[in-house]
Swiss-Prot record:
It comes from Synechococcus sp. (strain CC9605). Gene3D superfamilies: HUPs, Isoleucyl-tRNA Synthetase, Domain 1. GO terms for biological process: leucyl-tRNA aminoacylation. Residues 1-22 are annotated as: Disordered. It catalyses: tRNA(Leu) + L-leucine + ATP = L-leucyl-tRNA(Leu) + AMP + diphosphate. This is Leucine--tRNA ligase. Belongs to the class-I aminoacyl-tRNA synthetase family. HAMAP family: Leu_tRNA_synth_B. InterPro entries: aa-tRNA-synth_I_CS, aa-tRNA-synth_Ia, Leu-tRNA-ligase, Leu_tRNA-synth_edit, M/V/L/I-tRNA-synth_anticd-bd, Methionyl/Leucyl_tRNA_Synth, Rossmann-like_a/b/a_fold, tRNAsynth_Ia_anticodon-bd.
Length: 875
């Protein structure tokens, strides 16, 4: 760590001889952290009449190692929590651990350790790392989703949803590893469709699994986005697109030669019905077996096996060629009577819509590519200028126009034809208006061990029976062998699986799937309001006291799944009468990534560690001599651009790390790590140290003092600087949270005090200025602010003080500085009375040395005056 003596003093007016010690953040920060713990400074105020403020960071997976992305998230939330506490709120600022999931299970398999022990050890490590940051977290409310006293209530809430008809079982497709005989998560399948562990080609299989009916809430989830004014527009748009409301029609095509058998499709373009030249079923559609002809059955079956190896992402990728085969059946277009072939294709999914689509090649780009590949007809039915030429060139016409080749609907505008054709079909019984959503029901089953057990028992006599609530939690068996092979690990634990049915008493088996980890994170914020309740997951009274979360902070990567599931849970639990709130998070801040510099060989694609780059000005690959690309990218081990928070804290202290990460970029923008800027923040804190040391020589108490009736110019200037800072920092920390500009204001204030000089100020104004500066600093650099408060004679903790109050009278100036321009170029500045009007400003400007020099005695043709700002003289 650089010594204070090695840094130039920025402000010579500061009397550095008054220093009594060197800024040593390591000892100072540890001392104050221990003091805060002993005094319970960060404990949530439960009683009293203060309004509540719930500040929450998205809780982390306990990997065991804190990274700079974590630091940024938690420090931003901490500043908000500290400010709100000083503004008079009772603040709830808790922390927990999203502790179930695949990484711990994989680590257990690879290292032959118990995932619970592995996770608890990681939690202890990360808690200690978080403590070093000086976060004002109430650790008495800590929760870990893998502990049974938490997942007992996850199971309890699952039973609530089951009783409410929101949880159910059905068959669904999973990734199946045929070698290890187990189900794989999507992230365990590589880009070539192979298992990450065995290397086998992954197959798609149907398994009976648990779902939640999130689609029942599609409409309120979409409509209520409008009420989330405190959320980024980008996130609201992403959720709206994910929910994906579509208005259209369901149209039924009669199967040729089959009485009372139809294929129903959903389309948003019923106006193009006459242009349909084929119908496509998903390979998994149950109609395929009955509609496939004898001649095509072998071809169909072979194709279905090929498709079973593809992931959903591969099947729906726009860039991938669409493949299919005819099944040997035909349907009749209900509008035109034309007979159309039925195909199966890889791009149609059984779980979307009806599992069937009509192909209209002339007016859908995917359909035209499929038709051209398979020799299917392309019939234009929407005409507009340029439409025929586009279709002839292989580009589908997807815009509006006028109907052609559509019988009695020819000449109708496509916008009108949508309703007209749907209405015509409704009268004849083959169409109906329909609103659909892209959103699918939430599949929560996971064939893994390290997750929350699903509290259901399967009985041959009674079916799926909920575990009685008094028997919760259904605990995971510990100390079992995890090989990663042979299906669900729980299914192999016979002592755990085999139980008596709670309803009839006959032999039965436990559900061996565990829950998606998003189940645990969809309600954890509610538990924080009432963490020690042993009778229920939370009381309605506690939730009403603290919820909704006033400020939620986390990454944009959670914009859809976590945030959508949390909103669904909140609405569902409200409908069950458990809570009164309709939305969980009032305001949302999605912080940008922390990026580090990378060196990449564009030829080989390999990243080079900075330590191996000899010359940063001319970076080259040490092995090939190739010139390296220099980029800023998200920090990762594979790119050699990570920065260990512990190393930064060891060298500079937590306050410097906090100040840098808050100052370098606006919270929502990506942050580029720069060691020089870290050093710059350390130097700023050293300057503050010297400033307060000098001030403490004149002040031994922060009890308010009576200001003189007549202030000196120095006193007035510093008071104005102080209250300008109070006004600006308060604004920066209100609706639009701009922490970087708030720190800039602190720098301006410290410079104003230093440049004026400690000895030039009266004791009351010096006291007011330093008291205000330290309190404004407290949320950003809590340890140093506490030290300053103590050294200046403040009583109690600075973090229990009130936020500085703006005095508008301090902002009033007797004089102001205006800019003098000649022909629009700045040529000088002039001190003028603050009350000077246009005529007075013009007179003073013309009488100034600037006018004499640049006008050379000539009268200007024009004088432009902006009161209090500038005078522009135009010769």
């Amino acid at each position: 760590m650089p010594s204070a003596g090695s840094v130039n003093a920025a402000n010579p007016a500061v009397d550095t001889s008054a220093q009594t010690g060197r800024y040593d953040p390591t000892a100072l920060e540890q001392r104050w952290q221990e003091s805060w713990k002993a005094d319970g400074v960060d404990t949530t105020e439960v009683g009293g009449e203060k309004p509540g403020f719930f500040a929450l960071s998205m809780f982390p997976y306990p990997s065991g190692s804190l990274h700079m992305g974590h630091v940024r998230n938690y420090v931003i939330t901490d500043v908000i929590a500290r400010v709100q506490r000083m503004l008079g709120h009772a603040v709830l600022h808790p922390m927990g651990w999203d502790a179930f999931g695949l990484p711990a299970e994989n680590a257990a398999i690879e290292r032959n350790v118990d995932p619970g022990e592995w996770t608890d050890r990681n939690i202890d490590q990360m808690r200690a790392q978080l403590d070093r940051l000086g976060l004002s977290i109430d650790w008495s409310r800590e929760q870990a989703t893998c502990h049974s006293d938490y997942y007992r209530w996850t199971q309890w809430l699952f039973l609530e949803l089951l009783e409410g008809g929101l949880a159910y079982r059905k068959n669904a497709t999973v990734n199946w590893d045929p070698v290890d005989q187990t189900v794989l998560a999507n992230e365990q399948v590589d880009g070539d469709g192979r298992s990450w562990r065995s290397g086998a080609l992954v197959e798609q299989r149907q398994l009976n699994q648990w779902f939640l009916r999130i689609t029942d809430y599609a409409e309120p989830l979409l409509n209520d986005l409008d009420a989330l004014k405190g959320w980024p527009e980008r996130v609201r748009t992403m959720q709206a697109n994910w929910i994906g409301r579509s208005e259209g029609a369901e149209i039924s095509f009669n199967v040729e030669g089959a009485q009372n058998q139809t294929i129903t499709v959903f389309t948003t373009r019923p106006d193009t019905l006459a242009g349909a030249s084929y119908v496509v079923l998903a390979p998994e559609n149950e109609l395929v077996d009955s509609l496939s002809s004898e001649e095509q059955k072998d071809t169909v079956e072979a194709f279905r096996k090929e498709v079973a190896r593809l992931s959903t992402i591969e099947r729906t990728c726009d860039d991938r060629p669409k493949r299919g085969v005819p099944i040997g059946s035909h349907v009749i277009n209900p509008l035109t009577g034309v007979v159309l072939p039925v195909w199966i294709a890889d791009y149609v999914l059984a779980e979307y819509g009806t599992g069937a689509v009509m192909g209209v090649p002339a007016h859908d780009q995917r359909d035209i590519a499929f038709a051209q590949s398979n020799g299917l007809p392309i019939q234009q039915v929407i005409d507009a200028e340029g439409a025929a030429e586009a279709i002839a060139a292989g580009q589908a016409w997807t815009d509006a126009g006028t109907l052609v080749n559509s019988g009695s609907f020819d000449g109708t505008a496509s916008s009108e034809a949508k309703g007209a054709i749907t209405g015509h079909g409704a009268e004849q019984g083959w169409a109906r208006s329909k609103v659909t959503y892209r959103l699918r029901d939430w599949l929560i089953s996971r064939q893994r061990y390290w997750g929350c057990p699903i509290p259901v028992i399967h009985c041959d006599n009674c079916g799926a029976v909920p575990v009685p609530r008094e028997d919760l939690p259904v605990e995971l068996p510990r100390g079992i062998d995890l090989s990663g092979k042979g299906g669900s690990p729980l299914s192999q634990q016979s002592d755990w699986v085999n139980v008596a049915c709670p309803r009839c008493g006959k032999p039965a088996k436990r559900e061996t799937d565990t829950m998606d980890t998003f189940m645990c994170s969809s309600w954890y914020f509610l538990r924080f309001a009432d963490p020690h309740n042993t009778e229920k997951p939370f009381s309605k009274e506690a939730v009403n006291r603290w919820l909704p979360v006033k400020q939620y902070v986390g990454g944009i990567e959670h914009a859809i799944l976590h945030l959508l599931y949390a909103r669904f849970f909140t609405k569902a639990l409200k409908d069950r009468g458990l809570i009164d709130i309709n939305e969980p998070f009032e305001r949302l801040l999605t912080q940008g990534m922390v990026q580090g510099v990378t060196y990449r060989n564009a030829t080989t694609g390999k990243y080079i560690a900075p330590a191996d780059v000899a010359d940063a000005e001319d970076p080259r690959d040490p092995n090939t001599g190739d010139k390296l690309e220099v980029l800023f990218e998200k920090m990762s081990k594979s790119k050699y651009n990570g920065v260990d928070p512990a190393a930064v804290i060891d060298r500079y202290g937590a306050d410097t790390a906090r100040m840098f990460i808050l100052f370098k970029a606006p919270p929502e923008k990506d942050l580029e790590w720069d060691d020089a800027d870290v050093e710059g923040q350390f130097r700023f804190l050293q300057r503050l140290w010297r400033l307060v040391e000098a001030g403490s020589a004149r002040i031994d108490s922060l009890e308010p003092m009576q200001r003189p009736a007549d202030l000196s110019d120095a006193d007035s200037d510093v008071r104005r600087a102080l209250h300008l800072a109070i006004e600006a920092v308060s604004e920066d920390l209100s609706d639009e949270i701009q922490l970087n500009t708030a720190i800039s204001e602190l720098m301006k204030l410290s410079n104003a005090i230093s440049s004026t000089g400690i000895d030039a100020l009266s004791a009351p104004v010096l006291q007011e200025a330093l008291s205000g500066l330290v309190r404004l600093l407290a949320p950003f650099a809590p340890h140093l602010a506490e030290e300053f408060w103590n050294r200046l004679g403040g009583s109690g903790s600075v973090h229990r003080q009130s936020w500085p109050v703006l005095d508008p009278t301090a902002l009033v100036q007797d004089s102001v500085e205006v800019v003098i321009q000649v022909k629009g170029k700045v040529r000088g500045k002039l001190q003028v009375p603050a009350s000077a009007g246009k005529e007075e400003l013009e007179r003073l400007a013309l009488a100034s040395d600037v006018a004499e020099k640049w006008l050379e005695g000539a009268a200007p043709r024009r004088v432009i005056v902006v009161p209090g700002k500038l005078v522009n003289l135009v010769p």
